[in-house]
Amino acid sequence: MTNLLFTPTVQKIKADIGDLDVTPIVEKVVITMYKDYPYLEEKFGDKGKERTIEDNFYHFLYLNTAYKLKDTQTFLEYALWLNSILVSRGMKTDLIIYNFEKIKENMSGMLDKEIEESFLSYLDGGIQALKEYKQNSGIE
């Protein structure tokens, strides 16, 4: 049983993802993020945690879309778009990179092997794209 709050947005994303059950992965990632970065709760409160949960389901929606399309670029464009949105709201690119790294760590053995390998590749690409963005834009 999960402790995650399933907002209507999360319920819709889960329906869009389909048969792929990523809830246990999202739960581990969100718990780890809030443990490693306690300031998130202080700065963004319960609404911020809801958004973090939603964002992590969105990450999987775009990973799954890229997988179905066999198109890495789909996830790379999502990662860069997400970065522009979250940075404008006070987040740091490093936290998005960290989030993607935690997804990689926590999905090990949780998905079909072919899907997991594809998702790992897309996440690696997203992490690299964000690091290059940071370097090219001179962000610390």
Role assignments for model-derived ranges:
Residues M1-W81, V87-M91, I96-E101, S108-E140:
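Core of compact, soluble alpha-helical bundle domains
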